[in-house]
Swiss-Prot record:
Keyword annotations: Activator, DNA-binding, Nodulation, Plasmid, Repressor, Transcription, Transcription regulation
Residue ranges the UniProt entry marks as DNA-binding: 23-42
Function, as annotated: NodD regulates the expression of the nodABCFE genes which encode other nodulation proteins. NodD is also a negative regulator of its own expression. Binds flavonoids as inducers.
Top-level taxon: Bacteria
Entry similarity comment: Belongs to the LysR transcriptional regulatory family.
Protein name: Nodulation protein D 1
HTH lysR-type domain: residues covered: 6-63
Gene Ontology MF term list: DNA binding; DNA-binding transcription factor activity
Record bears the keyword Manganese: no
Name of the gene this protein is made from: nodD1
Length: 314
């Protein structure tokens, strides 16, 4: 099938090549033989009058022309998928849809487990693939490789629709035996102590509290960097290190790991965990249903003030 001289099947091949960056893997992903994919590459090069890819080792490296084509090709294919292929009404009780969600271990532990429990009741065949916060999470949404992102709203791109889920606040924590961490922690002591910090992905994307501290012109003495909040307490154990962590997660972890908790010595703002999704999914029935579930579960969460009150009592 040709449209204005272009075999539209070639766009599927081009998208697979851009995704896999390997001829064999790209062919496998769209159920083509390797010779057929090689032929498709030749036809693409002829049509666009460009090499499109060069081989570097075992990897196909796209040319600038291929890089410019890729977003439009992916958007066109996503639009076909959303508006034509996936047109059937979504029935949660009967669907076997898998939702791919990018989120931190913090969001998974304090929030998403409630979502999974509810969905297991209402849509038992629906499943989830939880993806870690990566350097290119915005690209995952744009390409349709993820259905949702849960992340601090201030750190989100403006390229996709979003909605607020719940507010969170930060506290300072240390090992239960850390005598240097007092409830009346001074800024001077906070800055001088060794810190455990969380950074996401290979680019070491800053967490919300680091982003705020840098805004105040403050740089901590970092002794350990980890890629998830759930690792932090183990890096504090038996040391005089401290960390800045979301209150809800501290409350949850404190059930099994003894922690000493103190208010931060500077007024870092509460932050909003938000939900973001690809613009092309905005009116999709599956996406709408899942967004409803996520927002309803978020609305049931206690406020940071109530969480702190319960923590002080316990």
């Amino acid at each position: 099938m040709r449209f204005k001289g272009l075999d539209l099947n070639l766009l599927v091949a081009l998208d697979a090549l851009m995704t896999e960056r390997n001829l064999t893997a790209a062919a496998r992903s769209i159920n083509l033989s390797q010779p057929a994919m090689s032929a498709a590459v030749g036809r693409l090069r002829t049509y666009f009058n460009d090499d499109l890819f060069t081989m570097v080792g075992r990897e196909l490296v796209p040319t600038p022309r291929a890089e410019r084509l890729a977003p439009s090709v992916r958007e066109a294919l996503l639009h076909i998928q959303v508006s034509i292929i996936s047109w059937d009404p979504f029935c949660p009780a009967q669907s076997d849809r898998c939702f791919r969600v990018i989120l931190s271990d913090y969001a998974a532990l304090v929030f998403f487990e409630k979502v999974v429990t509810r969905v297991a009741r209402e849509a038992p065949a629906v499943s989830f693939e939880l993806l870690p916060i990566a350097d290119n999470y915005d690209e995952y949404l744009r390409r349709g490789d993820a259905d949702f992102l849960i992340f601090p709203e201030l750190l989100m791109s403006r390229a996709h629709p979003k909605v607020a889920l719940f507010e969170e606040t930060l506290v300072c924590v240390g090992c239960h035996s850390n005598k240097l961490l007092s409830e009346q922690l001074t800024l001077e002591r906070y800055m001088s102590m060794g810190h455990v910090v969380v950074k996401f992905g290979n680019a070491r994307t800053a967490s919300f509290e680091e982003w705020c501290l840098l805004g105040h012109g403050l740089k901590r003495h970092v002794e350990v960097v980890v890629q998830g909040f759930s690792m932090v307490p183990f890096m504090l154990s038996g040391t005089e290190r401290i960390a800045t962590m979301p209150l809800r997660l501290v409350k949850q972890l404190e059930k099994t790991i003894p922690l000493r908790i103190a208010d931060l010595p500077l007024p870092l703002p509460a932050f909003t965990q938000a939900l973001q999704w690809p613009a092309l999914h905005n009116s999709g029935q599956a996406s709408l249903w899942m967004r409803d579930v996520l927002c309803q579960e978020a609305s049931r969460m206690p406020s940071p003030h109530e969480v702190m009150r319960r923590l002080r009592i316990s």
